[in-house]
Swiss-Prot record:
N6-(pyridoxal phosphate)lysine carried by residues: 231
Protein name: Neamine transaminase NeoN
Catalytic activity line of the entry: neomycin C + 2-oxoglutarate = 6'''-deamino-6'''-oxoneomycin C + L-glutamate; neamine + 2-oxoglutarate = 6'-oxoparomamine + L-glutamate
One Gene Ontology molecular-function label: transaminase activity
Summary of the function given for this chain in its UniProt record: 6'-oxoglucosaminyl:L-glutamate aminotransferase that catalyzes pyridoxal-5'-phosphate-mediated transamination for the conversion of paromamine to neamine in the biosynthetic pathway of neomycin. Also able to catalyze deamination at C-6''' of neomycin.
UniProtKB keywords: Aminotransferase, Antibiotic biosynthesis, Pyridoxal phosphate, Transferase
Source taxon at top rank: Bacteria
Family: Belongs to the class-III pyridoxal-phosphate-dependent aminotransferase family.
PANTHER family hit by this protein: GLUTAMATE-1-SEMIALDEHYDE 2,1-AMINOMUTASE, GLUTAMATE-1-SEMIALDEHYDE 2,1-AMINOMUTASE 1, CHLOROPLASTIC-RELATED
Metabolic or biological pathway: Antibiotic biosynthesis; neomycin biosynthesis
GO BP term, example: neomycin biosynthetic process
EC number of the protein: 2.6.1.93, 2.6.1.95
Length: 416
């Protein structure tokens, strides 16, 4: 257990033990993590979905190692890697211009502030998690702007329709796409509403971009005016990107930061994007994830455990019937060395081969055995589905409901 976490001002998201202390890992390779006791874990967290290729991918590692020696560019100025990364992103995600940043949070903030300046409109209508920046904190009164001019519509298209009645004040609608709790039809209606109102649509694909396919996951559904990607770019290295209309992103010309040309990060992005462009890692992830889900769903059913699984092999989420069962599920998984992202989305990497999957399936079977006291419990209901979706989306899952139901759900979930 780390002795220095109390010195850290932040409280970063990371795997923690039953006493909420950070777990300490000493090594990582492929789909495996090793903790300080020598225990080996199978990693479904993968740095919150940013390790797409697997830990220590040899191609990325070799590129980074070479750049670290000074043999492939310098932090002082431009290198060929800058051009390569820009060209790859443009080919994969489109747009007239592309900007580079160090985190998804920074990229989204820069993108929406640029759009706000370019349009001259004050409001941002938001749905989903856009990073740690306080600008996204919801206001105390639902459907009212916060101090930064952001209004959250919580993925409810009825609320968005109300907010778009005065489109002349709206700089952009900003959404973080989710493919576990929202259907393609939801996105098509969102695009229709934005187009009808003449409002810019920003897709914050920090999490899902490049993971589902070689490009934006909503390219055909939303055709966003501005996009942001990050986690699929560099296999865990600190880089993100913004792209879209030259007019809307013109204010980014003022952006510069000291580590812009840092060669190891650019090398990682270039190497990872070359792989991502083939579609092979995404296919491997989907196939491995789907196989695990088939086993997990059957194991849960055979054990009569009231746990659903939302999503597919690319990203999925456990939906336990109760919070007590949810806590027990993740506790049992920890005991068996399955490192899940507690309460959030699970994502395998392309390093999940036959041996890893076989071991993961055996461990999950033992997880279900540990949960035997919960067999035959109350079934999963809508309250559980909304609660779990809220944990991953910061918003409401797609389901039929009226305005009164929406208001009640928001009051309860925001209070929790």
């Amino acid at each position: 257990m780390t002795k220095n976490s109390s010195l850290l001002a932040e409280f970063p998201t990371c795997p923690r033990d039953e006493k909420d202390r950070p777990r300490v890992f000493t090594a990582a390779s492929g789909a495996w993590l090793t903790d300080e006791s020598g225990f080996r874990w199978i990693d479904f967290d993968n740095a919150r979905g940013s390790i797409l290729l697997g830990h220590g991918d040899p191609v990325v590692a070799e590129a980074v190692a070479r750049a670290a020696t000074g043999a492939d560019g310098t932090a002082t100025g431009w290198s060929r890697r800058v051009d390569a990364v820009l060209e790859r992103l443009h080919a994969l995600c489109g747009g007239e211009v592309v900007g580079l940043f160090r985190s998804g949070t920074a990229a989204v903030r820069a993108a929406v502030l640029a759009v706000r300046e370019a349009t001259g409109r004050p409001l941002l209508l938001s749905a989903g998690y856009h990073g740690y920046d306080p600008m996204w904190y919801p206001s105390e009164a639902p459907l009212e702007p916060n101090a930064d001019g952001v209004v959250d519509f919580f993925f409810d298209l009825g609320l968005l329709r109300e907010l778009l009645r005065a489109p002349e004040r709206v700089a952009a609608v900003v959404v973080s796409p989710d493919h576990m709790h929202l259907s393609p039809g939801w996105y098509r209606e969102l695009r229709r509403l934005c187009s009808a109102a003449g409002v810019v649509l920003v897709a914050d694909e920090v999490k899902v971009g490049l993971r589902y396919a070689p490009g934006l996951s909503t390219a055909e559904l939303l055709a966003p005016d501005v996009w942001v990607v990050a986690k699929g770019m560099a296999n865990g290295h600190a880089v993100s990107a913004v792209g879209g209309s030259r007019r809307l992103l013109k204010p980014l010309k003022e952006v510069s930061f000291t580590s812009f040309f840092e060669p190891t990060i650019l090398a990682a992005a270039d190497a990872a994007l070359a792989r991502v462009a083939t579609g092979e890692p995404q296919r491997a992830v989907r196939e491995a994830g789907d196989r695990f889900l088939r086993h997990a769903r059957k194991a849960l059913d055979d054990a009569s455990l009231p746990v659903e699984i939302a999503g597919d092999g690319t990203f999925f989420q456990f939906v336990p019937a109760t919070e007590e069962l949810e806590e027990a599920l993740y506790g049992a998984a920890n005991a068996e060395g399955l490192l899940f992202y507690a309460g959030d989305n699970q994502g395998v990497s392309a390093a999940f081969d036959e041996a890893v999957l076989g071991e993961a399936e055996r461990r999950f079977a033992r997880v279900c055995e540990r949960l035997a006291p919960y067999a035959g419990g109350e079934p999963v209901g809508d309250a559980a589905r909304y609660r779990v979706a809220w944990n991953v989306m910061d918003g409401l899952r797609q389901a039929p409901r009226d305005r009164e139901e929406t208001t009640g759900l928001l009051a309860r979930l925001l209070d929790d």
